[in-house]
Regions:
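Zymogen propeptides
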Residues: 2-59, 65, 71-196
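Active-site-adjacent helix-turn-beta-strand microarchitecture at beta-sheet edges
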Residues: 105-107, 170-256
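Extracytoplasmic
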Residues: 126-128, 163-164, 198, 234, ...
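Short beta-strand segments
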Residues: 132-134, 170-172, 206, 266, ...
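Short acidic-glycine loop/turn motifs at beta-strand connectors
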Residues: 134-137, 205-211, 242, 267-271, ...
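Short, solvent-exposed aromatic-acidic interface loops
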Residues: 146-151, 218-221, 277-283
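General beta-strand structural signal in soluble alpha/beta enzymes
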Residues: 168-172, 213, 307-313
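Conserved, well-ordered active-site substructure
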Residues: 179-197, 250-311, 316-352
């Protein structure tokens, strides 16, 4: 700034600051960076594991009882068969599915691999949307991260258009915050984005169809990966764990502890899940004020769930079924959970 008078130097300084703010705003608020996932290893199939020498070595000094017999049925029953990710229900709930092509209307969808039942109920002075999910293949329950563009957000209608194979869509967890950073554990369709298990409660869907919920810091990421993570959703709190309601609501912020619009996921057994949305964003229009955590926990117990997690609340709560949007959210979504046929194409590079 040599040769400039004081006023010119001030103008130049202000201009440089303005340029810096524009650059910051572009990278922090406008430009949508891609997030690069890490493919997670899957557990070995049954029979592929290398035997432990300590368990297979024969003691040369051991005596053998000639009258002893081995019961092959007892030996087989000592270790349960692993669940096939492509046949989670093992033949159960056959009446829920259709063997004569797809059958669907405004309240149900039935095919050979997927069965969905949708209903609305009035509970705790609120409108509750319930999707009862039966899937034979774990790859029918997926997450979309808005085409892997971190910070990007879309309306529920836009996601319905983006995911033509989606049979039902629900707003997902709060994996990203308003500061555009990832919160907690994030695994989407077998791809790992964040390994942090210490910030928030979370739910994990494994490749064998089981789902477990954890409070923050209660599980090690590497051990979860060894079991075969397929999805991980973060936010909370835990609503139901091992068939009981945990005592973790004391001291929760008002926006969590009081009545609010909410969306949550529940688990009954491998292949059987629930997505629940409690309306309330526009209480004057819907006559619905939302739900407290205690009310939502009680609902999942009534549904027969042994595990359940609160996924999100407030203005981003949204759901659609059969292409029909069920409510109007005030904010767009950064991610969504959706149900599809297991061979539906992957949209947005989110894995499958």
């Amino acid at each position: 700034m040599k040769g400039m008078n004081l006023q010119e130097q001030k103008k130049c300084g202000i201009l440089l600051i303005a340029i810096g703010l524009v650059i910051f705003a572009y990278f922090h608020h406008v430009r949508q960076p891609k997030i690069d996932p890490v493919g997670l290893s899957t557990p070995p199939a049954a029979g592929d594991a290398t035997p432990d020498p300590a368990q297979t070595t024969v003691d040369p000094n051991a005596t053998v009882d000639p009258d002893a017999t081995t019961d092959p049925d007892a030996a087989a029953s000592s270790s349960p068969d692993p669940v096939d990710p492509n046949d989670l229900l093992g033949g159960k709930y056959a009446e829920k599915f259709s063997t004569a092509g797809v059958v669907s209307d405004e309240t149900c969808y039935r095919s050979e691999k997927v069965a969905l039942e949708f209903r609305q109920e009035r509970r705790f002075d609120s409108l509750v949307h319930i999707i009862d999910i039966y899937i034979r293949d774990v790859h029918s329950l997926r997450t979309n991260l808005c085409q892997q563009v971190f910070g990007d957000r879309k309306s529920i209608q836009s996601l319905s258009d983006l995911l033509p194979g989606a049979l039902a869509i629900s707003s997902s967890d709060q994996y990203s915050n308003r500061n555009r950073s990832i919160w907690g554990l994030l695994v989407s369709n077998g791809l790992g984005y964040s390994s942090d298990t210490d910030i928030f409660d979370f739910a994990v869907l494994f490749l064998d169809g089981t789902m477990e919920v954890y409070e923050a810091g209660q599980a090690d990421y590497d051990s979860l990966v060894e079991r075969g993570i397929y999805q991980a959703w973060t936010f909370g709190p835990v609503l139901v764990k091992d068939g009981a309601v945990p005592d973790n609501y004391d001291g929760a912020p008002d926006y969590i502890a009081t009545k609010n619009p909410r969306v949550a996921i529940g688990y009954c057994e491998p292949g059987h899940y629930y997505l629940v949305m409690v309306d309330g964003t526009r209480a004057s229009e819907s006559g619905s004020a939302g739900a407290t955590l205690e009310e939502l926990s009680a609902l999942f117990l009534d549904l027969g769930c042994t595990q359940a997690l609160n996924l999100d609340g407030g203005g981003t709560v949204a759901m659609s079924f059969g292409g029909r949007v069920l409510n109007t959210s005030s904010r767009n979504l950064s991610s969504a959970i959706y149900v599809c046929e297991p061979d539906a194409p992957d949209v947005g590079g989110n894995g499958a």
